Amino acid sequence: MDPNCSCPTSGSCSCAGSCTCKACRCPSCKKSCCSCCPVGCAKCAQGCVCKGASDKCSCCA
């Protein structure tokens, strides 16, 4: 189990939009959780499960 995620690091799980984990990489969706997903950020939209919008977006710089 990922200590920052409610789902196991292996096996299937659901990565919902309300994900609160920091480093969840679920094999079933192959996406990581991201706290920065401003409007128009295509990179985050494709590779992250958004935890919440933020103006300070480091993963999309």
Curated annotation (Swiss-Prot):
Binding site for a divalent metal cation 6: C37, C41, C44, C60
Transmembrane annotation, as ranges: none
Binding site for a divalent metal cation 3: C15, C19, C24, C29
Keyword terms of this UniProt record: Metal-binding, Metal-thiolate cluster
Superkingdom of source: Eukaryota
Keyword Kinase: no
InterPro entries recorded: Metalthion_dom_sf, Metalthion_dom_sf_vert, Metalthion_vert, Metalthion_vert_metal_BS
GO biological processes: cellular response to cadmium ion; cellular response to copper ion; cellular response to zinc ion; detoxification of copper ion; intracellular zinc ion homeostasis; negative regulation of growth
Sequence segments annotated as region (Alpha): 30-61
Binding site for a divalent metal cation 5: C34, C36, C37, C50
Notes on the domains: Class I metallothioneins contain 2 metal-binding domains: four divalent ions are chelated within cluster A of the alpha domain and are coordinated via cysteinyl thiolate bridges to 11 cysteine ligands. Cluster B, the corresponding region within the beta domain, can ligate three divalent ions to 9 cysteines.
Function (record text): Metallothioneins have a high content of cysteine residues that bind various heavy metals; these proteins are transcriptionally regulated by both heavy metals and glucocorticoids.
Homology family: Belongs to the metallothionein superfamily. Type 1 family.
The protein, known as: Metallothionein-1B
Organism of derivation: Ovis aries
